[in-house]
Swiss-Prot record:
SUPFAM superfamilies the UniProt entry points to: Nucleic acid-binding proteins (SSF50249)
Entry GO terms, CC: small ribosomal subunit
Matches recorded under Pfam families: Ribosom_S12_S23
Gene giving rise to this polypeptide: rpsL
Species annotation: Carboxydothermus hydrogenoformans (strain ATCC BAA-161 / DSM 6008 / Z-2901)
Entry GO MF terms: rRNA binding; structural constituent of ribosome; tRNA binding
Role summary: With S4 and S5 plays an important role in translational accuracy.
Keywords in alphabetical order: Methylation, Ribonucleoprotein, Ribosomal protein, RNA-binding, rRNA-binding, tRNA-binding
Protein name, as recorded: Small ribosomal subunit protein uS12
Family membership noted in the UniProt record: Belongs to the universal ribosomal protein uS12 family.
Subunit and interaction comment: Part of the 30S ribosomal subunit. Contacts proteins S8 and S17. May interact with IF1 in the 30S initiation complex.
Amino acid sequence: MPTINQLVRKGREKVAVKSSAPALKGCPQKRGVCTRVYTTTPKKPNSALRKVARVRLTNGIEVTAYIGGIGHNLQEHSVVLVRGGRVKDLPGVRYHIVRGALDCAGVQNRNQGRSKYGTKRPKAKK
């Protein structure tokens, strides 16, 4: 334990908080261009073909981002909005593509949790 005099001279060292989405550089979202759109398989207990895209952000960093929801219209050179948020069963995927923003269309025929998938409110049936 340090003495009062040692604390006066040096002080306590602040513990730096590590960012979970460093490529965004503190921004809530970043725009980017898809360089590759492909499917990949998840870690051990799970089995699926997860849709992901390699995205070059406007700051020059290239990241792997997950495309949520059923079906998508993305291809190479699509302009997308990338937010933070990892996918637990895909190693190295620490970002999500925002559905319904820029070139990425919202999910079709979605009625619940629409705001998370960029889906407009359906017309009321009579």
